[in-house]
């Protein structure tokens, strides 16, 4: 079996519906050779919206399996797949909600999405394409409908009572969380419990060794099912991460979890969600392989939106140095927007050329780029959350596999925002993504190289070099709506331009509007 490229399956696991951990698991991957290479382009997919195999309107695991060839067909010579290396699958565990971030059974698949057999089949088919899958693992909280929480409500002497955090006479019930939210919630039995996000998601008590053991068992279970790693939801909030003591306890827990997972699979890939400033994020690299760079994502989108560089390369270099001080092997998790944010195409007011620029920047920076499903075809959407998670558009109209779990407000089809329409259009956003991913993968400098900012005499140009094993590529992005001329080193040849019109004569480089140029 070839070493898999990386797929991030964002299984934000809503907590296990069964009270036991004794679910037998067929081990899907056997005898994998260790590999240190965890670099790759990931695709974040919301299964419910992706592809419907059983015609009930909801996306499912069989549908995702059927459409793996859209993501990566396993043939490096074809041009019609995205050629991503990994899939991050959003939650697939049983849950009472549409998003499934409130788990009722950590050891199973939501029946709406399929079953464990479907999951294992997906893992095996991903293997065939050298694609890795990571699951979004939700360990901070369970659903309030989880059997553990229900048992805790019914019986104060239940062992599950101490799985959660309860108020006592000294508790300040008016305490607010880090974004001003209410964190103490009244249970049906009249008591108050702690929940960072809302009353339907009671936080687990990680001061309880039984909880830590339980969640380690959950991780081991899914590794045995064939998953290659985890996207760790709300990694900041296991303890109160905004406090020094809470942050320290968080890191100790993630060290414990990491050690247990690596014992099960030495190549496990762990990426965490710590939604905060780089200084808060950085210490978590002591425990994890990768963390999402929200600060850099904001700079990319705001710069492209404004049409002038707001310090993208400087920020990328600074966070790179900071993160490496905690983990020299860190892998930055870079992205434009995700399932909790307004879609990048809406942020860019539907401007396809700006969307191409944002993609080009993302796919030439250090780290593992994450593409949110639909980003590659220009899907739009603004909060509330349901509207940034609308059905993926395969067709201009209706067609086989098109999901319909909700009526789209933004992405209704018929306006060119579909795989069907953009595959036929040579200069489409989809084909731009296909091309830029391949350009990245063809040059080790862009995958593994260090970054250094290049000073240019134009705020409309984002410029940096990527260097690996003594070889460098200089990257220039014109993010304005006008052609730009900049001075560059006389040496070096133009090896790639995102579209025609770029020209290098000695030390003068002309870059058309919203275009990217590589010089080597």
Swiss-Prot record:
Family: Belongs to the glycosyl hydrolase 13 family.
Signal peptide: 1-27
InterPro entries hit by this protein: DUF3459 (IPR022567), Glyco_hydro_13_cat_dom (IPR006047), Glycoside_hydrolase_SF (IPR017853), O16G_dom_2 (IPR045857)
Subunit relationships: Monomer.
Entry's cofactor comment: Binds 1 Ca(2+) ion per subunit.
Swiss-Prot/TrEMBL cofactor(s): Ca(2+)
EC number: 3.2.1.1
Enzyme kind, highest EC tier: hydrolase
Name assigned to this protein: Alpha-amylase
PANTHER family: ALPHA-AMYLASE FAMILY MEMBER, NEUTRAL AND BASIC AMINO ACID TRANSPORT PROTEIN RBAT
Active site: 233, 273
GO BP annotations listed: oligosaccharide catabolic process
Marked site: Transition state stabilizer: 340
Keyword match Metal-binding: yes
Keyword presence, Hydrolase: yes
Catalytic activity: Endohydrolysis of (1->4)-alpha-D-glucosidic linkages in polysaccharides containing three or more (1->4)-alpha-linked D-glucose units
Organism for this UniProt entry: Priestia megaterium
